[in-house]
């Protein structure tokens, strides 16, 4: 049976970017690739435990030689910052103890939480934990996302839905969710609801539209600032103007030389070759 690949990994370099930005080629203990991966996992686990009410959508990690930068994208920055920055200082201290390096902590607010798949999945899971009917929670989340501007949304819940003896999966979809279109900007989120009768997994796909228009705008804005190169030749980026090669009907008229000149050119050619020899 068919399986669904993670939309973020499927579109890396096209519509999505890595959430960890660093490079490791050292063989020293603590600076190897596997050490950094383990450290990233622990940092994200630290952000997820005890911060459920903060609505953390994404944690980005960037490393330099002696510093680690952690960007927290949250729907409620006040909870992460705390009173007079006390909570932010506590998080920074725990991160410095975990990494052993200086930590730069940036707290960024999510402007539209209804369009963030991770936050939508977390919201549905919290309602399931509060014994809200799963169909009502799913449909309410889909309506909120569509009002916020989503072109399509799909929500899937798996587990002992409604406390049933047999676990099953159910999903609802509104609008278009083209999972195989690489230019489609699709956000994906997953969260687990811990209920009294077991865990229920919630998956959310949100289709925000194609990125072609955005890419064209970025290319148009970056075109004047480029240096000299093949792409700066006049008329070539658009593909419509190719200079003399465009009008092929003009060539016969230009090549129609008098017949009397042809023997003279041919006769002069051996003399030139003999002179060079």
From Swiss-Prot:
<dbReference type="GO" id="GO:0003735">
    <property type="term" value="F:structural constituent of ribosome"/>
</dbReference>
<dbReference type="InterPro" id="IPR018280">
    <property type="entry name" value="Ribosomal_uS3_CS"/>
</dbReference>
<feature type="compositionally biased region" description="Low complexity">
    <location>
        <begin position="254"/>
        <end position="277"/>
    </location>
</feature>
<keyword id="KW-0689">Ribosomal protein</keyword>
<dbReference type="Pfam" id="PF07650">
    <property type="entry name" value="KH_2"/>
</dbReference>
<keyword id="KW-0687">Ribonucleoprotein</keyword>
<protein>
    <recommendedName>
        <fullName>Small ribosomal subunit protein uS3</fullName>
    </recommendedName>
</protein>
<keyword id="KW-0699">rRNA-binding</keyword>
<dbReference type="GO" id="GO:0003729">
    <property type="term" value="F:mRNA binding"/>
</dbReference>
<keyword id="KW-0694">RNA-binding</keyword>
<dbReference type="GO" id="GO:0019843">
    <property type="term" value="F:rRNA binding"/>
</dbReference>
<feature type="domain" description="KH type-2">
    <location>
        <begin position="43"/>
        <end position="111"/>
    </location>
</feature>
<dbReference type="InterPro" id="IPR001351">
    <property type="entry name" value="Ribosomal_uS3_C"/>
</dbReference>
<feature type="compositionally biased region" description="Low complexity">
    <location>
        <begin position="218"/>
        <end position="228"/>
    </location>
</feature>
<feature type="compositionally biased region" description="Basic and acidic residues">
    <location>
        <begin position="229"/>
        <end position="244"/>
    </location>
</feature>
<comment type="function">
    <text>Binds the lower part of the 30S subunit head. Binds mRNA in the 70S ribosome, positioning it for translation.</text>
</comment>
<dbReference type="InterPro" id="IPR004087">
    <property type="entry name" value="KH_dom"/>
</dbReference>
<dbReference type="InterPro" id="IPR009019">
    <property type="entry name" value="KH_sf_prok-type"/>
</dbReference>
<dbReference type="GO" id="GO:0022627">
    <property type="term" value="C:cytosolic small ribosomal subunit"/>
</dbReference>
<dbReference type="InterPro" id="IPR015946">
    <property type="entry name" value="KH_dom-like_a/b"/>
</dbReference>
<feature type="region of interest" description="Disordered">
    <location>
        <begin position="218"/>
        <end position="277"/>
    </location>
</feature>
<comment type="similarity">
    <text>Belongs to the universal ribosomal protein uS3 family.</text>
</comment>
<dbReference type="InterPro" id="IPR005704">
    <property type="entry name" value="Ribosomal_uS3_bac-typ"/>
</dbReference>
<comment type="subunit">
    <text>Part of the 30S ribosomal subunit. Forms a tight complex with proteins S10 and S14.</text>
</comment>
<dbReference type="GO" id="GO:0006412">
    <property type="term" value="P:translation"/>
</dbReference>
<dbReference type="InterPro" id="IPR004044">
    <property type="entry name" value="KH_dom_type_2"/>
</dbReference>
<dbReference type="Pfam" id="PF00189">
    <property type="entry name" value="Ribosomal_S3_C"/>
</dbReference>
<dbReference type="InterPro" id="IPR036419">
    <property type="entry name" value="Ribosomal_S3_C_sf"/>
</dbReference>
């Amino acid at each position: 049976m068919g399986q669904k690949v993670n939309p973020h990994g499927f579109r890396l370099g096209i519509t999505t970017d890595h959430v960890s930005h660093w490079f490791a080629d050292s063989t020293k203990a603590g600076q190897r690739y596997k050490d950094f991966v383990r450290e990233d996992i622990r940092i994200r686990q630290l952000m997820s435990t005890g911060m459920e009410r903060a609505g953390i959508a994404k944690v980005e990690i960037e490393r330099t030689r002696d510093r680690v930068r952690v960007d927290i994208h949250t729907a409620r920055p006040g909870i992460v910052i705390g009173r007079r920055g006390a909570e932010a200082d506590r998080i920074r201290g725990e991160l410095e103890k975990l990494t052993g390096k200086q930590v730069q902590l940036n707290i960024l607010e999510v402007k539209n939480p209804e369009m963030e798949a991770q936050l939508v999945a977390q919201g549905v899971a919290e309602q399931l934990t509060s014994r809200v009917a799963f169909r009502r929670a799913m449909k309410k989340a889909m309506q909120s996302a569509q009002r916020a501007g989503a072109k399509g949304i799909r929500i899937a819940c798996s587990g002992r839905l409604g406390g049933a003896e047999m676990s099953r999966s159910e999903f609802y979809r509104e609008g278009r969710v083209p999972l195989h279109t690489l230019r489609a900007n699709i956000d994906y989120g997953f969260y687990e609801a811990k209920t009294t009768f077991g865990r229920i997994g919630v998956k959310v796909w949100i289709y925000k539209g194609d990125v072609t228009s955005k890419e064209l705008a970025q290319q148009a804005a970056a075109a004047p600032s480029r240096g000299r190169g093949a792409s700066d030749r006049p008329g070539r980026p658009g593909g419509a103007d190719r200079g003399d090669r465009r009008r092929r009907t003009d060539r016969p008229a230009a090549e129609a030389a008098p017949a009397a000149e042809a023997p003279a050119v041919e006769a002069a050619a051996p003399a030139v070759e003999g002179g060079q020899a």
